[in-house]
Amino acid sequence: MLKLKPAFALMLALPVIVGCSTNDNRYDPVDAPEIKNLFSLDEVWSSSTGGTGDFYSELTVAFDANNVYTASRDGDVMALTLDRGSKVWSVDLADEDENDERRSARVSGGVALGGGKIAVGSENGYVYVLNAKDGSILWKQYIEAEVIARPAFSASGDKLFVLDARGNFTAFNALDGSKLWVTGDAPQELRLRAQSNPLVVGDEYVLVGTSSGKVNVLLQSNGSTVNQVNVGESVGKTALERIADVSSSPLILGNVLYATSFSGGMVQYDLSTFNYIMRLGYQSSRDLGYDEHSILVTADDGTVSCINRADSSQRWANTSLGYRQVTAPVVFGNYAVVGDYEGYIYFLDMQDGSIDYMEQSDSSGISAQPKVQNGKLYVMAKDGSLNVYSYTDQARASAAVSVEQSNDMLAASAAAGLTLNHPGVYDGGIYAPSGVSQEALEQRRAAIIRAVAQQEAQIAAQRRAAEEAMRARAEYEKRRAAYEEERRERLSGFGIAQGIRSDLDEAEDTASESADTEYVEENNTEATTESTTNDSEDDNTKSSGFGIY
């Protein structure tokens, strides 16, 4: 479920409550579908990890070769073995001094894993980095703002990137917690509670969505913004209409960036040519699912859609889970798997979107995206139950592993060898570090302005061309309709009633009249001649030539 900032949410809620006498239930969740399961699912193991209770949170798990790492809202961070779910270690962050006067540690962003370390963020404004081997706290930093999004380590694990609720994006030295740089966009007046999880590309770039509807591409070295992809536009008369957050995580597959926004649809952007491939009308605030051939989108109304990567066509859309607070999807074998607010998990066939299996994993509900690791499905419930499943059908299990391996390869090769800097934008980007002179900063700013202007001009030209084509088409249809109407009016009397004459009849009559005229004129000439030579003839004889008698 989407949540807005509390103060604004309350302001928005008041008029809704006052005006609800009409019993409008358009946004009420539909009942869970009733289906006949086509296969069985085995529970491998289950463990309690603390959970998030009644609070909205997308806290999810992280994996390494041997363990799965979890965190709860209260501050319980633990490592469990992948094979049996046995506890390796656990740490309670609520025991830290800074949380003594708080209700709990209020962990809300995590879990991130990299370089033998794990990281989580809290609504209390703290970032914690722990040793993945034993859970010992390596360092912590207070950043004076809530951390909702999951932090991200660089590929080598030497940097940690954190997005806070104010829109600030901070890079830390992952070894000692020292701050390397800070950048960011000013937050919008009204925005979603959820935030985009940063996406790391090697040790050079990091991508993050913003509340202004953009995906920023930054250099890990100094935080400079070297490219910016417009996904949603913050337009409208009211703050509510202007919500355009990119709160889903950016996704890179090959050379293509995929991103969705709350109100602006989905964008496919070619990172090798810096051109927009396609804009599609799939609005979402949840992360995307994918495999080698497909992109999966969960809309905020509960619709789950499958898009063909090859041509961006829609393969299917399942609308049977309307407003059930459906999670982000994940591909597991031949299925797209999602959860909902009542704790059901659904297996949607990747070919046609039909639900082939459903089960209530936990009655407390599911808000975090399910995860797949080593051919097994990991489902985290709101009460902290971590349930792990596998297929009974070995063929399906093999398919699940195959898809997982393929996805790992896609993720590992994301943007490999690409330069993500927009043409004309170099290391300085838009936001330069403090060591850069004002003159150099202005030069870089001018370069980015020119690049953006060129891009906007190209988009505007394309838009004008499309509008002109639409106007020409409309004019053509208007003229065609007028012609057809005129033609129908001209032809409406053919053979229907006497006295209605066609164009052919008129032409024949005209020809006949012309012939008669010539005949009359000829006779008149003869009559005149005859009259001249026979003036003395009888009047009755002359009159007889005119057809009177």
Where are these regions (language model features)?
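C-terminal motif of bacterial Sec signal peptides marking the signal peptidase cleavage site
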Residues: V18-G19
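Long, low-complexity, compositionally biased polyampholytic IDRs enriched for Lys/Glu and Gln/Arg
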Residues: Q438-S492
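Structural signature of WD-repeat beta-propellers
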Residues: S72, S122-E123, D164-A165, T210-S211, ...
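Extracytoplasmic beta-rich repeat domains
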Residues: D24-V30, I35-A62, K87-A112, W139-S156, ...
